[in-house]
Every structure is written in structure tokens, then in C-alpha cells.
Design a protein with these regions (language model features):
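Flexible, compositionally biased loop and terminal segments
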Residues: 14-252
Length: 252
């Protein structure tokens, strides 16, 4: 049966989404912790690198799916501050793959008006990769239809510490510091939807690992019992439908 689509105005733009999704409350910001690439490879008797390659392919497809639902902001946690402890060969492979991922997403971003933003440290990223990231940020900085946050060399506590350092450099009066002021020093500063509404983690792991610990205070979490390379569009539909069923109280 043909997919029935309907035109809706979301985030100021006319888009086509599945008609059944119009009845749901679509999150403005989804963050994904893509866990399980290495375990997927091991279970399929494949090298670790193949698990990561499959994961990159899935990340691109899932990004398109999420945008098709009208979600404005997607945060993809690509590489944590702790991932540097992995083998040198694996890290080098991942950094090369991130270069290709950034290049591929830039082409898509220019077509779809997606703003690419890097979350995380910049001082430890290889120069060639950092150059691609900065080029992508520069070329898409005026776009506002969608945002793709790529969290690379990112850690939630590290983000908070870096924000505190910037506060001290700007001589902010800490005695009168507000939540809004502090938020302006985080990596998500000046974004329309800096706080994730829904965080999806794959591979059955039920922990946050510190992703966006400041911004995610009232986020809804959905833990999927499948490795990231096995993630399908239907899993995103399920997560959004489950999110819509929940009643968010925001502490009230």
C-alpha cells in the first residue's frame, strides 16, 4: 500500500510526513547514542571496522528518517572523550570514516538546508578532520530548517567544565549567574532547541553515559535492545510513538 503523506508546516517549513504521524507530538530534538557497532561485528564474525562502517551507513539513513518526521534537531554522539582509550588502529579508522561522514553530510546539508554544528573539544581532533568540520559549520551556518549536532570528542562533564572555563574568561558574576546565562556557554548555545526531548540508545545499554547532562534534565529515554547497525526506520517510528504516549511533567 502506498504511504499516505500529508503536508504540514513544521519549524516554519512545509514538509510531507506520514499521515499517521500527524496525530503524534513530534519531538523538536532527538539525540542518539549509537551503541553496539563492535558487538554487532563480533556477532556476525566480522572485523570491528565493518561494524563501524555499517554504523556510519545507518546513521545517514536514520538522519533522513528523523528529518522526514519533522524533527528539527538531531544530535548524533559520534565519539566520546573516553573513546581515545581504544586501539590506535581503531581510532585512526574512525577518524578517516568521520571525514567521509562529514563530507557526505555536508552535501546533504546544502541540499536540505541543514545546519551542521560540532559539539565537543576541538583541540584533540586530527587537523584534516577538524578542517572538514569547520568548513561544514561555516558553509551551513545560515541554515535554520534543521540542525545536525555531531558530538565528536564529546563528554557531558567535559562540556560543563569547558563552559565554566569560558565563564571565568568572560568575568561573569558567578553570584548572580542564571541558568540561561550558563546555557549560553554550552556547546548548544543559541540553538532554538538545545535540550533533547528524546534520547535513544541502542544495544540494550540502559545508561546515559553523560550525554548532554545539563540539557537532558527532562529528556525522555528509550533504550532499544538491538545494536546500532541493525537500527531501522521502524525503530524510529516506535520511539517517536512511545515518546508521544508519555506525559512530560517537567518537575510539576
Amino acid at each position: 500500500e502506498d504511504l499516505k503523506l500529508v503536508c504540514q508546516i513544521l519549524n516554519g517549513y512545509a514538509i510531507l510526513i506520514p499521515i499517521e504521524m500527524t496525530l503524534l507530538h513530534i519531538p523538536n530534538h532527538i539525540a542518539i547514542i549509537p551503541d553496539g557497532n563492535r558487538r554487532w561485528a563480533k556477532e556476525h564474525n566480522l572485523p570491528t571496522f565493518e561494524g563501524h562502517r555499517r554504523g556510519f551507513d545507518v546513521a545517514t539513513k536514520i538522519g533522513k528518517k528523523i528529518r522526514s518526521l519533522g524533527v528539527h534537531t538531531l544530535t548524533m554522539w559520534a565519539f566520546s572523550t573516553e573513546n581515545w582509550e581504544r586501539s590506535k588502529d581503531e581510532i585512526n579508522y574512525l577518524m578517516r570514516m568521520y571525514e567521509l561522514f562529514i563530507e557526505k553530510n555536508l552535501r546533504q546539508a546544502l541540499k536540505e538546508k541543514i545546519r551542521i554544528i560540532h559539539l565537543g573539544r576541538k583541540d584533540r581532533i586530527p587537523k584534516t578532520l577538524l578542517k572538514r568540520i569547520q568548513n561544514s559549520e561555516e558553509k551551513t551556518k545560515t541554515f535554520d530548517k534543521y540542525i545536525l549536532n555531531i558530538a565528536l570528542d564529546y563528554g557531558g562533564t567535559d562540556e560543563v567544565i569547558r563552559a565554566i572555563h569560558r565563564l571565568s574568561e568572560d568575568n561573569i558574576d558567578l553570584n548572580n549567574l542564571t541558568i540561561e546565562q550558563f546555557s549560553n556557554f554550552l556547546d548548544t548555545a543559541n540553538q532554538p532547541y538545545p535540550n533533547p526531548d528524546l534520547i535513544i540508545r541502542t544495544s540494550g545499554e540502559q545508561r546515559t553515559s553523560g550525554l548532554m547532562i545539563w540539557q537532558a534534565a527532562y529528556a525522555e529515554y528509550i533504550f532499544l535492545n538491538k545494536h546500532f547497525p541493525d537500527l531501522k526506520n521502524e525503530d524510529i517510528d516506535y520511539a517517536v510513538e512511545e515518546y508521544a504516549r508519555r506525559q512530560r511533567r517537567f518537575g510539576k
